[in-house]
Amino acid sequence: ALENIGLSAAWTMTSLLLAFIWNIILLIFRKFTKLRTLLLTGHIMVQQATTVTWIVFLFIPGLRNIWGAVAVGILIGTYQAVFSNLTVEPTDRLTDGEGGFAIGHQQMFAIWLADKIAPKIGKKEDSIENIKLPGFLQMFSDNVVSTSVLMFIFFGIIMLVLGEDFMRSLDDTFSQTTAFGFYIFSKALSFTVYLNVLQAGVRMFVAELTESFKGISDKLLPGAIPAVDCAVAYGFAPANAVTVGFFCGALGQFLAIAGLLIFHSPVMIIAGFVPLFFDNASIAVYANHRGGVKAAMILPFISGIIQVLGGAVCAYVLQLVAFGGWHGNFDFSTIFLAVSYIVKYLKIPGVILCVIAMLVIPQIQYAKSDKEKYFTVGQKDDEY
């Protein structure tokens, strides 16, 4: 299968283009589809097109051609349109109507779930920003301090396990005159710096993007909402929400990995940083806004477990164990686990069934919403 997939890899970019066009078509007919978002996160579009191309080409060998690319484009374009649409209301609540964007990433279903479940776990008033730590622990209220300490512990353990010699062979910047302890400390601080730069820049990014997109959408796609990278949401949450999500998600992943070891799983998953950080930080941001610190801790922890266990099943079902595994983001350890089974056993009718099932979701959203406000939610209210 891998050789055939390699020969057909060029179809991935065709699938990506078709997915984007299909997303636009669904928006043009939004009166009927009830969809409002256009996914614009380029690297995510590439990852998703590549993954779904593998699924379809693996289980339906007869579609390793242009028709397979069309099937993949429609399938992934529908997913991108439908599940980014699910994040409109949660993001509008998070930004108090100021954002003018939705999320277009790999945990859109998780964000919707967090927004629904978090109020049942905790209280919004118990937000991370309202926590008062006693005595010297108050310094951890500053996200720079808390993130630096957490990353020092997290990266420190990993680097100590790998060993100084291995790290020197891996990193050319690790000079012979630098002590191993100082090297670990500097890397932890570097991560903190990068995170703060990311958080500081997101509002500027969102403001520029939404204004630019508005100029285009007013002419071509009136009322369309841009679905962008999940990191843009971090600027609308307490800074420590990101750190809490990362830490609790890591605990969940490590617990699940330990379970795989204890029960001698035929598939072993290694924690991947992208799902570990971006999925769980995003879940914590939305969970904290709706259910406070308790939800921001519990939901990323559960997500970490699902990422590992769902990823292990996906890697096994999709025959990827020998080829490096699975990227393990929440939606691809849940939604596309189900899609994989359906396509595996139902073939082409399975692809059609998945598309139809996803297109039903916005119809249910619309039926349960305030219909007068449905197409105005997510539109930016005011300038920053």
Task: Give residue spans per PLM region.
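Residue-level marker of positions within ordered structural domains that often coincide
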Residues: I158, K214, A287
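Signature of multi-pass transmembrane helix bundles
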Residues: I5-E211, L220-A231, L320-Y384
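Hydrophobic alpha-helical bundle architecture
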Residues: I5, I28-R36, C230-A312, Y316
